[in-house]
Amino acid sequence: MTNFEELKWRGLIKDTAGEDIEEKINKGDITFYWGTDPTADSLHLGHYSSLVTAKRLAKMGNHPILLVGGATGLIGDPRPTAEREIISKEAVESNLEGIKKQVERLFDGNVEVVNNYDWIKNFNFIDFLRDVGKYINVNYMLDKDIIRRRLSTGITFAEFSYTLIQGYDFLHLYKNKNCIMQAAGSDQWGNITTGVDLIKKMTGEEAYAFTMPLVLDKYGRKFGKSEGNALWLDRNKTTSYEIYQYLINVDDELVIDYLKIFTFLSKEEIEVLDEENKNHPEMRNAHKILAREIITDLHGKEAYEEAVEISKSLFKGDIKKLNANEIETAFKGLTPYQITEEKNIVDLLTEADICKSKREAREFITNGSITLNGEKIENIDFLVNKNVAIEQKYVVIRRGKKKYYIIKF
């Protein structure tokens, strides 16, 4: 396959700009950019498809630039339905540094990170209108999907101007970095074409761009959302275990598509996994390899192996194999019930709201529905103290088959 054919096979090409873009990508040795606004101090799994595509283009012999929008982040990309909240300058600067470090680590330093505030700050309002606004027709902007959808509910001038700044970013990089191509998610097509058209009008030369389809789950939600919350790339915000659980449970019908998008496995390797997934879906080999490739890339091999071990221990109910740090990782979403002294199991189950009453607690114990650190408790006089806690700190209580509670000394 040619470079462009591989991108198409992996489902990474939706819209394109530039007549000979296929030839440019196949030839390689071009400078391209991908941009994001620093709306948080970490990127999330939804951004990861674009990052992997940028890494893929780099492996094809091209030169990546990541633009972090210190200027555009102060305004906010127009949403389809409502205005974004304005972020403070201090938050934008802090977020920008966090994202920069994250991206440089993912690319092993082989990426240039730029901040559009560095060149936008030098514009005064009149100069921007003369040098940029003069070349963009209002009717042209009104025809863009995101603008058109907001007209009925109202759109601020700041949001309306966002596409001008992003368009100028492409022009600036084109002139100063010989950056001839932009890659982005398909929701950015309107902003991308502004840049392509601006370059054409101001230089008479052609620029190139392509968009990637947004990665969705089977319900049409953006990939990387777990119960409405983003799965962050920063380990301190989202653990490797949380990402592992999300990936190991993705829909069978989508796992092969995700392998194409998010991994560097070859076509032949993915086709083998496709056959295995069709013939033996219960083995979940494709899911396991998807998790292995993503987590190893994001957090390292050791973090992936730890996530696997935590998952195995919980599945087998072998809680005692986990250490205190692994307990914290595995049950990050649970608020521990804290105690400072020895407690009778019946009293503890009631006080911690694990059971509604002492009578119910005794019933759960006698019918074998309560386990403590993986071991069934059948004695209503059992005492919970530091000696039974993992590292004298944590007690994991399971009620029934799936309901977990954490007790902390």
Residue ranges and their predicted role:
Residues 1-188, 193-196, 202-208, 221:
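NTP-dependent nucleotidyl-transfer catalytic core
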Residues 201-409:
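Conserved nucleotide- and phosphate/pyrophosphate-binding catalytic cores
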